[in-house]
Amino acid sequence: MLQKFISKSNQSLLMRLLAENFKHQAPWYGIAIGSMVVVAVMTSASAWIMRDVVNSTVVSKDIEKVFGVAVTVAIIFAVKGLATYVQSIFLSKAGNNIIAHTQRRLFEHVLRQGLSFYSIYPSSELLVRLTNNAQAVRSVIELVVTSFIRDLFSLMGLLAVMVIQQPLLSLVSAAVGPGAILGVRVLTRKVRKIMELEIASIGQIIQSVQETSTGIRIVKAFALEDFMRRRMDKYIGDVERRANSIARLEAASSPIMETLSGFAIAGVIALSGVLVLQQGNTPGELMSFITALLLAYEPAKRLARMRISLESALVGVRMMYQLADHPIELTEKNSAIPLPEGPGEIRFKDVNFSYKNGERLFQNLNVTFPAGKTTALVGPSGAGKSSIINLIMRLYDPDVGSVTVDGHDLKDVTFRSLRDRIGFVGQDTFLFSGTIKYNISLGREGASDEEIIEAAKTANAHDFIMKMPHGYDTEVGENGIKLSGGQKQRITIARAMLRNAEILIFDEATSALDSESEIQIRQALARLTRKRTTIMIAHRLSTVTAADNIVVMEGGQVAEQGPQGRLLSQDGVYRRLYELQLLPSA
């Protein structure tokens, strides 16, 4: 019967939603539904007893019966009030549990995704789907429970009172039904289309706020305030217009229902007068019927509007499932084992690799990163340096071939054990909102304060930290906005120090720093890389002179490799890059 209230395209969506969520909250919904049945029965009883109220006071004028009826009315409304309270409490409990469950499930799914996923879903869209769309799940289920079960029970009970007492009047009242159904169906289709556009506009607002916040220096430097203001004004205006359109469409059901109900009530009053005056019906029966009819109006109106509200909320549910059903590209084998301890030799063997656009980057790539040695990756942009790092960290899998650590294929080991063996410092330093101590401690869970301080000292970060207002408890702001570039970089190095990993990866760790900061960070890196397998991506060749081995990438292939002295003695790619960067121009 519920399927009659929604479009065919949404029926399977609703059934899936109920199957996945309703059963987990069955005890709470069971109590709530039981309370709704009590409310429906008491509502019907309040209409039924109006017959005795009128007949005992107007017809029989029996004072004892009047007092008895008064006590019964008080009991009816007390029971109804208590049942309504219980219903509200357990509906809220179940609804809040559903939101929490949905958000945890979506966030876990997002965490398991590979990097390509984030090019499809920008952060603003993820925020909408984790908040608004999770709320939509609760809204749909509560609509089903309250508007369908509660209102349907109440309507059925009141209709029973009406039919038992006055079948003919009940038939007159039902004559308005087809008109109401047709009007609501037209409104529903319009609401669904506008709701999809409104949700997209909300995502644009969130994205604009994020971009303005994270790029505030660029906004100020290029005097983009007016541009950002105009863009935000457009997005807000779009949401406002669409919200107003939805409000108008939803409100349009009220005049439809009010007008049709007015005709029904007018017809009932006219016909009931004839029945009382000419056929001897008691005034109590008439009053009871009209009371039931008036009480039935509200649940009938809510049921009529339910389709509009349900279709609107299901737009958010559909978007939530689009995210929840997005396939996970990188998965861990059931037979995956923890990566055993070892020296940390990394080997690429006959690796073919391409990104989603289909253009092949590596073709039969073979390269080895010796254990305990520092290897520099150099070459022009687009040569594949960062892609090698992505494969080592298993952010992607090769199409063909294998990447191994100490002879273990990365596909055969667990994600956690692999990444626990790797310390990473990137060019684009990222700090989480929180304190300096918190950001360093992310390098290793459970690290003591002494270990955190020692890591900071090794990274040449301790001195500047102690000059901060609250030392290690100083808040860094969103993405470390309160710190300089060099300070942020040294904190990320301290984080890698604390990890104490056998494999270290540095992706242009000093490229954007001033000379003093670069010297301090180079000193920190020299201490950190001792006796560890280290891979350094560098565009500035001055940073790789001390590397044990230099791998020169060009066009997705290893063009040449060896220590710097040997590469400079050859007339190759490295020598050409070296002369361009480090030798004075003629």
Swiss-Prot record:
Residues 29-312 form the ABC transmembrane type-1 domain. The keyword ATP-binding applies. InterPro entries: AAA+_ATPase, ABC1_TM_dom, ABC1_TM_sf, ABC_transporter-like_ATP-bd, ABC_transporter-like_CS, P-loop_NTPase, Type_1_exporter. Disulfide bonds: none annotated. ATP binds at residues 379-386. Its main location: membrane. It is found in: Cell membrane. CDD domains: ABC_6TM_MsbA_like. It is a multi-pass membrane protein. The chain crosses the membrane at residues 30-50, 66-86, 162-184, 256-276. GO terms for cellular component: plasma membrane. It comes from the Bacteria. Keywords: ATP-binding, Cell membrane, Membrane, Nucleotide-binding, Plasmid, Transmembrane, Transmembrane helix, Transport. Residues 346-580 form the ABC transporter domain. One of its GO terms (molecular function) is ATP hydrolysis activity. Belongs to the ABC transporter superfamily. PANTHER family: ATP-BINDING CASSETTE SUB-FAMILY B MEMBER 10, MITOCHONDRIAL, ATP-DEPENDENT PERMEASE MDL1, MITOCHONDRIAL. This is Uncharacterized ABC transporter ATP-binding protein y4gM. It comes from Sinorhizobium fredii (strain NBRC 101917 / NGR234).
